[in-house]
UniProtKB/Swiss-Prot annotation:
SUPFAM superfamilies: Nucleic acid-binding proteins. This is Small ribosomal subunit protein uS17. Gene3D superfamilies: Nucleic acid-binding proteins (2.40.50.140). Belongs to the universal ribosomal protein uS17 family. The lineage of its organism: Bacteria, Bacillati, Bacillota, Clostridia, Eubacteriales.
């Protein structure tokens, strides 16, 4: 699999309590199939953070990768915006 074809997401760090792992919540808007109302949905991903550089509330870019553990299939590419 080429790196250019891997999925990327931008999300917010919701937990950094694990060693070399962060939890990132990715927000998205979905239209309800029957009523048409726009609903906010979020999904949490466990992300590999090799250098423990991301902190809570940082906006980060993550990329799909090979399975690194039971739950981790994403890795940190860059920190888009640091938390204030």
């Amino acid at each position: 699999m080429e790196r250019s074809n891997r999925k990327t997401r931008i999300g917010r760090v919701v937990s950094d309590k694990m060693e070399k792992t962060i939890v990132v919540a990715v927000e998205g808007k979905v239209r309800h199939p029957l009523y048409g109302k726009t609903i906010n949905r979020s999904k949490k991903f466990k992300v590999h953070d090799e250098n423990n550089e991301a902190r809570i509330n940082d906006r980060v870019l993550i990329m799909e990768t090979r399975p690194l553990s039971k739950d981790k299939r994403w890795r940190l590419v860059q920190i888009v915006e640091k938390a204030k």
